[in-house]
Amino acid sequence: MEQEQDTPWTQLTEHINIQKKGNGQQTQKLGRPNLTRLMDHYLRIMSQVDMHKQTVSWKLWLSLRNPTQGSLKTRALKQWKSFNKQEWTD
């Protein structure tokens, strides 16, 4: 059976209780996830997503305030492509 790789998510969501058997081997028992740690992880991820969204919208706003020839060309091309897609679907 393939063993799961130890990722930050599995480290966060799994409590590993190591128990010794009589023959000296260690077994791992997966416990319930710690809800506080899960929520903390979720909030951190969502915060990073929000920061990314703010950065993207800020860059877009700056490009509209002070457009370069390249950014105008890119916007026009995107609008033309989306317009063509709508024509084909209508």
From Swiss-Prot:
Residues 1-29 have a biased composition (Polar residues). Oligomer. Interacts with human SLC25A6/ANT3 and VDAC1. Interacts with host MAVS. The record marks 66 as: Low pathogenicity. Signal peptide: none annotated. Residues 1-31 are annotated as: Disordered. The keyword Aminoacyl-tRNA synthetase does not apply. This is Protein PB1-F2.
